[in-house]
């Protein structure tokens, strides 16, 4: 089997990708048997290509799966941990903008009774 390109895989459906993955795994097992029995050098060099092709297929499957999950959870209140933005622990625990802007009754009263004074400087 020739080297597989990821862009060719992206257009395929999941069933097709899984079938191709099975074919590649069968081919890899045959190549490994040929390696043990003393197969040709062309077959031995093909092992690497097949392994990388399997990795490409799995990568495309996982990426499309994650993309679909992102679409599903878009706009929802709760998301799985792996779909949330990766921040530091401190940043995740920080107050959000709304919580930061909240003021106590006492603070609101003080600001209302004693507004900020504006001074004009005479030139």
Swiss-Prot record:
<feature type="compositionally biased region" description="Basic residues">
    <location>
        <begin position="86"/>
        <end position="96"/>
    </location>
</feature>
<dbReference type="GO" id="GO:0003735">
    <property type="term" value="F:structural constituent of ribosome"/>
</dbReference>
<feature type="cross-link" description="Glycyl lysine isopeptide (Lys-Gly) (interchain with G-Cter in SUMO2)">
    <location>
        <position position="25"/>
    </location>
</feature>
<keyword id="KW-1017">Isopeptide bond</keyword>
<keyword id="KW-0689">Ribosomal protein</keyword>
<keyword id="KW-0597">Phosphoprotein</keyword>
<dbReference type="GO" id="GO:0006412">
    <property type="term" value="P:translation"/>
</dbReference>
<keyword id="KW-0963">Cytoplasm</keyword>
<comment type="subunit">
    <text>Component of the large ribosomal subunit.</text>
</comment>
<dbReference type="InterPro" id="IPR036049">
    <property type="entry name" value="Ribosomal_uL29_sf"/>
</dbReference>
<dbReference type="InterPro" id="IPR018254">
    <property type="entry name" value="Ribosomal_uL29_CS"/>
</dbReference>
<feature type="modified residue" description="Phosphoserine">
    <location>
        <position position="29"/>
    </location>
</feature>
<comment type="similarity">
    <text>Belongs to the universal ribosomal protein uL29 family.</text>
</comment>
<dbReference type="GO" id="GO:0000463">
    <property type="term" value="P:maturation of LSU-rRNA from tricistronic rRNA transcript (SSU-rRNA, 5.8S rRNA, LSU-rRNA)"/>
</dbReference>
<dbReference type="InterPro" id="IPR045059">
    <property type="entry name" value="Ribosomal_uL29_euk"/>
</dbReference>
<keyword id="KW-0007">Acetylation</keyword>
<dbReference type="GO" id="GO:0022625">
    <property type="term" value="C:cytosolic large ribosomal subunit"/>
</dbReference>
<dbReference type="InterPro" id="IPR001854">
    <property type="entry name" value="Ribosomal_uL29"/>
</dbReference>
<dbReference type="GO" id="GO:0003729">
    <property type="term" value="F:mRNA binding"/>
</dbReference>
<feature type="modified residue" description="N6-acetyllysine">
    <location>
        <position position="19"/>
    </location>
</feature>
<keyword id="KW-0687">Ribonucleoprotein</keyword>
<protein>
    <recommendedName>
        <fullName>Large ribosomal subunit protein uL29</fullName>
    </recommendedName>
</protein>
<feature type="modified residue" description="N6-acetyllysine">
    <location>
        <position position="43"/>
    </location>
</feature>
<keyword id="KW-0832">Ubl conjugation</keyword>
<feature type="region of interest" description="Disordered">
    <location>
        <begin position="85"/>
        <end position="123"/>
    </location>
</feature>
<comment type="function">
    <text>Component of the large ribosomal subunit. The ribosome is a large ribonucleoprotein complex responsible for the synthesis of proteins in the cell.</text>
</comment>
<dbReference type="Pfam" id="PF00831">
    <property type="entry name" value="Ribosomal_L29"/>
</dbReference>
């Amino acid at each position: 089997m020739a080297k597989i390109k990821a862009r060719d895989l992206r257009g395929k459906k999941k069933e097709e990708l899984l079938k191709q993955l099975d074919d590649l795994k069968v081919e890899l097992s045959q190549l490994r048997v040929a390696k043990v029995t003393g197969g040709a050098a062309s077959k031995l060099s093909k092992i690497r290509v097949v392994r990388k092709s399997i990795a490409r297929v799995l990568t495309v499957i996982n990426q499309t799966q994650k993309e679909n999950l992102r679409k599903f959870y878009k706009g929802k209140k709760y998301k799985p941990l792996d779909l949330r933005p990766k921040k530091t622990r401190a940043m995740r625990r920080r107050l959000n903008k709304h919580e930061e802007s909240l003021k106590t009754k006492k603070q609101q009263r003080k600001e209302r009774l004693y507004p900020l004074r504006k001074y004009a400087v005479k030139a």
